[in-house]
């Protein structure tokens, strides 16, 4: 049996309102639990449209047929009008999710984090994280114990900024296996659970066709030599490609794969995890930098 952590990112108002309820129903039908990470502040995702001038981002949008994949309400959110507050508008849905699944913070403002966190000060990072955690805790009525950086935009500064919040784990980067981020030679931070597998929008196109994606990604899960973690998005697998995701759950079960919340991947003694650090890097299929796992030593 292969155990795979299932991470569900919720970036937008529509993803929360429409995608999450469908995902909850789908997961319930198949007896699967996952980790949901919510954006709870303003939905300004449409402001990413200016990135179309960048060839890699434009190619990604064309390759994934973004207009039909996400919908124009997502692609234009927060452009001609102020972004609506996701948490306030969907508190009931978020509370229901937290009743049945591990629930953590993705971002206060997903667009702002993805665009500006790379040059924010530690204080600005802490203030933004605190705003998101406070809002999410007010909605679900219990402490937030985990987080996942929006767009995997994280580095050593983000690791340090999250330390005051006493989280059980963070999932801020791409990598191969769980690790303890090294803060100083004699100090480590909150355990990291990296995403190890590609997302739909990173690979779909000439190399991998939609109809063969599930076969392809299951093969990658079974071949993963580390601790497999897979990310889906409420805006994609919860709406347009919900049938594809349901088919994935069936195929994965038949292949001996069990999905679980990320928290279930943590060992009893986190001190046993290897040391590492998060550095800025790039991966195929994703425009811009993102946090990547790198080995480190205590010396």
Swiss-Prot record:
Gene3D superfamilies: Glycoside hydrolase/deacetylase (3.20.20.370). It catalyses: 4-deoxy-4-formamido-alpha-L-arabinopyranosyl di-trans,octa-cis-undecaprenyl phosphate + H2O = 4-amino-4-deoxy-alpha-L-arabinopyranosyl di-trans,octa-cis-undecaprenyl phosphate + formate. GO terms for biological process: 4-amino-4-deoxy-alpha-L-arabinopyranosyl undecaprenyl phosphate biosynthetic process; lipid A biosynthetic process; lipopolysaccharide biosynthetic process; response to antibiotic. It holds the Pfam family Polysacc_deac_1. Its EC number is 3.5.1.n3. GO terms for cellular component: membrane. InterPro entries: ArnD, Glyco_hydro/deAcase_b/a-brl, NODB_dom, Polysacc_deacetylase_ArnD. Residues 2-260 form the NodB homology domain. GO terms for molecular function: hydrolase activity, acting on carbon-nitrogen (but not peptide) bonds, in linear amides. Keywords: Antibiotic resistance, Hydrolase, Lipid A biosynthesis, Lipid biosynthesis, Lipid metabolism, Lipopolysaccharide biosynthesis. Catalyzes the deformylation of 4-deoxy-4-formamido-L-arabinose-phosphoundecaprenol to 4-amino-4-deoxy-L-arabinose-phosphoundecaprenol. The modified arabinose is attached to lipid A and is required for resistance to polymyxin and cationic antimicrobial peptides. Belongs to the polysaccharide deacetylase family. ArnD deformylase subfamily. This is Probable 4-deoxy-4-formamido-L-arabinose-phosphoundecaprenol deformylase ArnD. It comes from Salmonella heidelberg (strain SL476). The gene is arnD.
């Amino acid at each position: 049996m292969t155990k795979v952590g299932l991470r569900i990112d919720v970036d937008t108002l529509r993803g929360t309102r429409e995608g999450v309820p469908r995902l909850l129903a789908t997961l319930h039908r198949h007896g699967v639990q996952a980790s949901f990470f919510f954006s709870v502040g303003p939905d300004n995702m449409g402001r990413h449209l200016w990135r179309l001038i960048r060839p890699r981002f434009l190619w990604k949008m064309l390759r994934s047929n973004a207009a039909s994949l996400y919908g124009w309400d997502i692609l234009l959110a927060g452009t001609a009008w102020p972004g609506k507050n996701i948490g306030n508008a969907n508190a009931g849905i978020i509370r229901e999710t937290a009743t049945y699944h591990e629930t953590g913070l993705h971002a206060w403002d997903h667009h702002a984090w993805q665009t500006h966190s790379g040059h924010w000060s530690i204080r600005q990072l802490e203030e933004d994280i605190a705003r998101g955690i406070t809002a999410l805790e007010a909605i679900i009525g219990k402490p937030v114990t985990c987080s996942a950086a929006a767009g995997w935009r994280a580095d050593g500064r983000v690791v340090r900024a999250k330390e005051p919040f006493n989280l059980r784990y963070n999932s801020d980067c791409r990598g191969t296996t769980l690790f303890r981020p090294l803060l100083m030679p004699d100090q480590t931070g909150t355990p990291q659970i990296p995403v190890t597998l590609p997302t739909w929008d990173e690979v779909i196109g000439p190399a991998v066709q939609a109809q063969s994606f599930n076969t392809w990604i299951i093969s990658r899960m079974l071949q993963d030599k580390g601790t497999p973690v897979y990310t889906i998005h409420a805006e994609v697998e919860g709406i347009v490609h919900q049938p594809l995701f349901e088919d994935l759950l069936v195929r994965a079960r038949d292949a001996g794969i069990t999905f679980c919340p990320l928290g279930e991947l943590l060992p009893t003694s986190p001190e046993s995890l290897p040391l590492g650090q998060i550095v800025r890097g790039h991966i195929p299929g994703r425009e811009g930098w993102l946090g990547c796992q790198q080995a480190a030593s205590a010396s």
